[in-house]
């Protein structure tokens, strides 16, 4: 698991970009691997409003820590400009990032 603050452009394979505001604005983080509790990352818990997922990557984003509660699955190279549309705006507390090879 790795979380780095500050991103630009689009995520690579195995990466998910999280943004504090809608439309990929504000503070941002690059996540690789699973994070079971966003409270362990300063400033990240319950603040994410938009998401980008890299190629050959899927993300499972959970409302609660330890991969519990409501969640959404995001497919490779997908983008969500406003998590309000998924009832998870400013409410994400854990994530699973999975990579796969193309067929």
Curated annotation (Swiss-Prot):
Keywords noted in UniProt: Cytoplasm, Repeat
SMART domains the record matches: XTALbg
Compartment(s) of residence: Cytoplasm
Keyword hit for Cytoplasm: yes
Organism of this sequence: Physarum polycephalum (Slime mold)
Physiological role: Structural protein.
GO CC term, one of those recorded: cytoplasm
Similarity-based family: Belongs to the beta/gamma-crystallin family.
Protein's GO biological process: cell-cell adhesion
InterPro entries registered for this protein in UniProt: Beta/gamma_crystallin (IPR001064), Ca_cell_adhesion_N_dom (IPR015059), G_crystallin-like (IPR011024)
Official protein name in the record: Spherulin-3A
PROSITE patterns to which the protein is assigned, alphabetical: CRYSTALLIN_BETA_GAMMA
């Amino acid at each position: 698991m790795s979380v780095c603050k500050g991103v630009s452009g689009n995520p690579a394979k195995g990466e998910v970009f999280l943004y504090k505001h809608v439309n990929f604005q504000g503070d941002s983080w690059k996540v690789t691997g699973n994070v079971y509790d966003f409270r362990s990352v300063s400033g990240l818990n319950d603040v994410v409003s938009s998401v980008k997922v890299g190629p050959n990557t899927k993300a499972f984003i959970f409302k609660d820590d330890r991969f519990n509660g409501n969640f959404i699955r995001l497919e490779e190279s997908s983008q969500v400009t406003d998590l309000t549309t998924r009832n998870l705006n400013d409410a994400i507390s854990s994530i699973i990032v999975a990579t796969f090879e193309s067929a």
